[in-house]
Amino acid sequence: MEEVKQSRGVRDTSIALYKRHLNKLAMDITGKEYENEKFLKTKADEIIKYLDDKSNSVRRNFSASIMVALSPKQKNSPTDEYRGVYERYAKLLTEGQAKYLESKKDNKMNSKEEKNWISFNEVISLRDNLSKKLKKEGVKMTSTDISKSNFDLLQQYLVLSLYTLLPPRRNEYATMKIINKKEYLDLDESELKKNNYLINLSKTNKMFSYGSEKVKSKIEGGNNTINVPKELNSVLNLWLHFNKSDNLLVTQQGGMGMTKNQLTLLLNRIFKPKMISTSMLRKIYLTNIFGDEAERNNKKEKIAEQMNHSVSVAENIYIKDV
């Protein structure tokens, strides 16, 4: 996989995902960890049979990881030894992609989405109720301390604000670091690519920097920056008044940073008994924001950039008929 990283410029997160897929295949089929591409050739029949039992999206993702391993330097360039088996996996990927897009084309919810779906207005209402609770508890900028329960409430309020006062992104906020202007200007290109930052320029001015290696979709130029809107800036000021760590989101009042999985668990707790993740919030947001066809065409390109996905993904995957 080191060759893949050097030759293709693939992000570390993608490399880790490829490794997980290949190791799972090897463990499930041979009981041993993945060693090299010979396994993908000698066990091709078993691998394809194994993937035939999986969902379209799983089959598609595993096929992509296999093809990267068989053609590490660039796409569609395996050695002659692996050309035949590469084409078999390429066919599997193409068929999986076609079935996946076909299943999403009518924008109908699946059973899981139907069970957990709420409107965007309900998300807003929940956020506003948290704000009222905090005010009732006397949590404000002039407070000198905060209880553990109110600290948790405040973080819940922050999370819902992050995903409603800006077009909702994926789980990038989980590992985001807080830095000041000087620290930001001192960062080199590698650090900007590898990390996500909240840059605290002043009480009235902040921005987010999303690194190209920390997000799913490709970002040109290494990182993407977005100015924090006024209402979200006020929420952040209140949060930073009590959160003295350099982590935007924390697992406890002591300041330990979150993982992406922990952010998902926090969202599940906020929306309980509904199981709502960042992916579901993105679908809810886009379904709400795009009205008639004219309005949809005017908005979708700008929204897609802010949410870090393509317009086609917004149309085919995220926007749901309700």
Question: Where in this protein do the model-derived segments appear?
Answer:
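Non-catalytic DNA-binding core/recognition domains of DNA-processing enzymes
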Residues: 5-93, 279, 283
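Alpha-helix N-cap/helix-start motif at helix boundaries, enriched for small hydrophobics
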Residues: 15, 172-175
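Flexible interdomain linker/hinge and immediately adjacent N-terminus
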Residues: 79-140
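Basic, Lys/Arg- and aromatic-enriched nucleic-acid-binding interface segment
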Residues: 123-171
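Active-site-proximal segment of tyrosine recombinases
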Residues: 174, 276, 283-286, 293-308
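Conserved tyrosine-mediated DNA breakage-rejoining catalytic core shared by Y-recombinases
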Residues: 176-230
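Active-site/catalytic core of tyrosine-dependent DNA strand-transfer enzymes
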Residues: 221-285, 290
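Catalytic-site neighborhood detector that most strongly recognizes the C-terminal catalytic loop/helix
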Residues: 291-294, 305-322
